[in-house]
Amino acid sequence: MQERYSPTAVEAAAQQDWQARDAYRVTEHARNADGTEKPKFYACSMLPYPSGKLHMGHVRNYTINDMMARQLRMRGYNVLMPMGWDAFGMPAENAAIKSKVPPAKWTYDNIAYMKKQMQAMGLAIDWSREMCACDPEYYKWNQWLFLKMLEKGIAYRKTQVVNWDPVDQTVLANEQVIDGRGWRSGALVEKREIPGYYLRITDYADELLDQVRSGLPGWPERVRAMQENWIGKSEGVRFAFPHTIAGADGQLIQDGRLYVFTTRADTIMGVTFCAVAPEHPLATHAAATNPELASFIEQCKLGGTTEAEIATREKAGMRTGLTVTHPLTGAPVDVWVGNYVLMSYGDGAVMGVPAHDERDFAFAKKYQLPIRQVVAHEGKAYSTDAWQEWYGDKQGGRTVNSGKYDGLPYAEAVDAIAADLAAQGLGEKQTTWRLRDWGISRQRYWGTPIPIIHCADCGPVPVPEQDLPVVLPDDLIPDGSGNPLAKNEAFLSCSCPRCGKPARRETDTMDTFVDSSWYFMRYTSPGNDQAMVDARNDYWMPMDQYIGGIEHAVLHLLYARFWTRVMRDLGLLKFDEPFTKLLCQGMVLNHIYSRKNAQGGIEYFWPEEVENLYDAKGAITGARLKSDGSDVNYGGVGTMSKSKNNGVDPQALIDTLGADTARLFVMFASPPEQTLEWSDSGVEGANRFLRRLWSHCHAHRDAVARGLAAGADWAQAPAPVKDLRREVYGLLKQADYDYQRIQYNTVVSACMKMLNAIDDAKLPEGAHADAARAETLGVLLRVLYPVVPHVTWLLWRELGYTHSLGDLLDAPWPHVDEAALVADEIELMLQVNGKLRGAIRVAAKASKADIEQIAAAQEEVARFLEGRPPKRVIVVPGKLVNVVG
């Protein structure tokens, strides 16, 4: 055994051994030595995009997964921890444009490097199950399931107003628009009408909502709330404003009815205007003879189409000059075009009730429209001067200024008004959803080709199943001028499967969230080219633990739940929910330093380039450059980012201090679900701990060898030995509990306390001491192993534990010796007249009389009572004894 800890040598030796025996390959229905079947556990991290290098967020995510997998394997589980690559997407195209290489080469080069990094981390991954989204053998099943959804009517083609990213030149789903900008490019999103394919996720809205409300107890409440809000179930009334507006063909537009949906039918008597979306047929009709309105409508199309984007945009509108008829009063109602109305939501029109809707109130004030109160609250005076929160409160109010509906509370008013609208054939109660069907068409090259052929005679024709996969050419180099598939004749040209005439392939590719909606199930069925999943999927799924960032709460996680249900309904699965438990790990943060450059932009500096300035309390107040002493701004801590020069390269850390140091720090610095603030001193501390562990094992290797060879009668052990065993097993009990709670930072803390206890123990020489060192160090190595597998694995082997307990990967998890936790003696605080004067040790089973006698005989008692006899002795069991004199 080497005297000094060398992480490079240690980690190379461990990884070489694991690789040589394929230590992490798993099979279904694995059995114990006695023939009983092991329980399965499927733990999976969200697959990474192969951007080129791992970042510290990856290290944290995968170490959490790895700790879980290793510890459960020691506890007797058959554990699956797979890995794959979310390899399609726009970054590969953008990189290809810059470097003038095909996206395929860029992607596979990155995968090769990142895979080496993962292996250097020592992750317990079963690489025999590796998948890659850009592999035709994988995306063939995207295409196959799409065709099945097309057959069932779940997939369909339509033209709709969409979010268009002018930089990435593609359509974005609503979820991919953040504050009006594309989620990748950051460009302002535009509205365009484009044909594309959609998936009826709305058909599953009820089920998705019901399950997220009550059927996912293992998910964070925050994620469940985000999904519930996104699905957005609304119960209300859909009704029509009749009109006589005819189009150029002389026919009534939309059959003479302007439909709206409202959850506040009780306020219908307060309608003073209607607003329609810029794309609404009435808006188009009015704009045909109104150039100013036409210009306004074009301006409206420059924004995104999501509710989140609409909510933050300044509300603007323009009168169309058209009127519709109030269905209950017969009064004319002006029609406006509003930039806040979504054509894709409901009927693309809303009723305006300024008195009881804050948005309508602001709109009415801006354009000086009437405001008519129709709900009153007792003791509160309504004023149109400024909005007050109670104006929109439907609970506790009663209708006023509403004719025959006056005096009704909310629910009764809704029922009465809905009944009257239904009697006229103008409305009915209805449920609507915020959730929209999922548009999957993307005008990009690097994605799954949509398996459709366009024939001049037959129209869009599905590619026959036997012709799948439609293989994406992997040698094209995008130039930034649109989809290169549209210019690639070899890909485009084909024959119509129905009539045999020349035809053209669909050039749109699928949204990359299709790839990530089921990859975790492909891990369970590797190598099967005849089926999307097979019986092995029934063994592993649903997944026991999923690990990933909360930024995927609405996008990936919702789509995966939908995709699972589609596969279930096609008879491919026997379960509803893919993920039993979900852990969203926190971000990794680091300090941010910047200043304005000469061009007016912001220049960022690496933390190692600056020297911090502190106030009297030690808080950072600013910083200066080490190179020239000039001031820079300190921006606090933020998520590690290449653009802000505050990232830490995991590979550099692994190369210098080792993967175990990196793993130990990211697990110790913070609970897994909370943010982690990077600390160079914390990293150094983690490395010091490992060096100290190694030194201790080296110093006591002979004692451990003797202790392993001989047994021990612990009942006859001296007190220091019993104390050490009691402390270590107490810490093991806590670590067991923390492993179950996935509180890995306190597991590491327990390990550090164990080493302190073992290192500091003053054990008398002899067989008991040797046996205690061997036993307690064996406990420590096993508890610490899931965190730092390389160094613990080698120490386990070097110290001889393998001979009696087997290889550390499958060594039995240590059991708490409850007998060791029972103390022979206990320590009681000694007080004299209520003041602490020392401590006494008594037998754990000592009687009250024995304790009183021992306490009264202490020298401290005689000294502080100045020779007086005690008047009484108060014993607080297990804590203290107070001698009163």
Swiss-Prot record:
- How far does the signal peptide extend, from start to end residue? none
Q: Where, by residue number, does ATP bind?
A: 642
Q: What is its EC number?
A: 6.1.1.4
Q: Which Pfam families match?
A: Anticodon_1 (PF08264), tRNA-synt_1 (PF00133), tRNA-synt_1_2 (PF13603), tRNA-synt_1g (PF09334)
- Annotated GO biological process: leucyl-tRNA aminoacylation
UniProt cross-references to InterPro entries, sorted A to Z = aa-tRNA-synth_I_CS (IPR001412), aa-tRNA-synth_Ia (IPR002300), Leu-tRNA-ligase (IPR002302), Leu_tRNA-synth_edit (IPR025709), M/V/L/I-tRNA-synth_anticd-bd (IPR013155), Methionyl/Leucyl_tRNA_Synth (IPR015413), Rossmann-like_a/b/a_fold (IPR014729), tRNAsynth_Ia_anticodon-bd (IPR009080)
Q: Which reaction does it catalyse?
A: tRNA(Leu) + L-leucine + ATP = L-leucyl-tRNA(Leu) + AMP + diphosphate
Q: Name one GO molecular function term.
A: aminoacyl-tRNA deacylase activity
Top EC class, one word: ligase
* Matches recorded under PROSITE patterns: AA_TRNA_LIGASE_I
Which compartments does it reside in?
Answer: Cytoplasm
Where on this chain is 'HIGH' region (motif)?
Answer: 48-58
**Looking at the UniProt record for this protein, which Gene Ontology cellular component terms does it annotate, in alphabetical order?**
cytosol
Q: Which domain of life is it from?
A: Bacteria
Task: Tell me which family the UniProt entry assigns to this protein.
Answer: Belongs to the class-I aminoacyl-tRNA synthetase family.
Protein name stated in the entry: Leucine--tRNA ligase
Organism of origin is Bordetella petrii (strain ATCC BAA-461 / DSM 12804 / CCUG 43448)
**What taxonomic ancestry is recorded?**
Bacteria, Pseudomonadati, Pseudomonadota, Betaproteobacteria, Burkholderiales
